Amino acid sequence: MMLQISISMSVNMDTVEENIVSELRLSPIQAKVYVLVVKKGKMSTQDIAQHLNVSEDEANQAATSLIKNGGFIDITKTEFESMHPRFAIVNMYRRMCERENIPFKKNILVDNISIILEKPYDDARTKYNR
């Protein structure tokens, strides 16, 4: 029993999108857009659409919804940037709890999502890594 719990609590870059969908109750496209911008840095809807092979409208809808969910900030009407994962993931979790009328409390899996995304976020925004 204990082994199953520890396995289900693990998050890595291969499972982060599905964990975002399950724990934050975002759509798969929202999760893909969020992780992409975390990894790449500030992006336009056109860049997001090209990277994910979706329409610009789909990219814009997903990015705009991520602003409303507390994960993104808008730089311009068509450029988006992620907030730091430690803040963004908790913001999105808190908003999901409010939407779903679930008590907001500590969630180890949500914490692990933010931890796994912290390094790619920092790497994409540090000039020494470019």
Residue positions per predicted region:
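Alpha-helix C-caps/helix-loop-beta hinges
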Residues: K40, N69-G70
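Short, cationic-aromatic polyanion-contact patches
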Residues: N19-Q30, S44, D74-C97
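Short amphipathic alpha-helical interaction segments
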Residues: N53-K68
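Short alpha-helical "packing" element that flanks the helix-turn-helix/winged-helix DNA-binding module
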Residues: Q30-V37
